[in-house]
Curated annotation (Swiss-Prot):
Residues of the signal peptide: none
Coiled-coil spans in chain: none
GO terms (BP aspect): mitochondrial electron transport, ubiquinol to cytochrome c
Species annotation: Cervus nippon taiouanus
Membrane topology qualifier: Multi-pass membrane protein
Keyword Transmembrane helix part of the UniProt annotation: yes
Keywords: Electron transport, Heme, Iron, Membrane, Metal-binding, Mitochondrion, Mitochondrion inner membrane, Respiratory chain, Transmembrane, Transmembrane helix, Transport, Ubiquinone
Record's protein name: Cytochrome b
Subunit record text: The cytochrome bc1 complex contains 11 subunits: 3 respiratory subunits (MT-CYB, CYC1 and UQCRFS1), 2 core proteins (UQCRC1 and UQCRC2) and 6 low-molecular weight proteins (UQCRH/QCR6, UQCRB/QCR7, UQCRQ/QCR8, UQCR10/QCR9, UQCR11/QCR10 and a cleavage product of UQCRFS1). This cytochrome bc1 complex then forms a dimer.
Amino acid sequence: KDILGILLLMLFLMLLVLFAPDLLGDPDNYTPANPLSTPPHIKPEWYFLFAYAILRSIPNKLGGVLALVSSILILILMPFLHTSKQRSMMFRPFSQCLFWILVADLLTLTWIGGQPVEYPFIIIGQLASILYFFIILVLMPITSTIENNLLKW
């Protein structure tokens, strides 16, 4: 039974690739390219759109690249920034609230990264980028300190 399903799936994929390769493609890929500017439909994969939005939110190229790199590196450094004595978030309502705000901010940045560079999206991207760094670098350590002090009671 399993081999039959795998063979049917492989047959379907082979038919798709060999007889209709453009069926799942983006029609924007067939427009003539301007070598002086990046086409608007060119964007990174969905899991890097939040970093792309942070890159575009800073007008300076070097500043944007530094913000992009730091936005990814900060995710690697987050376990080291965690200074709370209690490891679980079950009994830490401030951290839970902060976590869900960060998730909403990351979803907003991901959405903005896929939008064109126009007026309302630029401002939203800049505010969401500031909030991203503010939550991770300022609010999370302060929240951990407050919750550590509450544990002493």
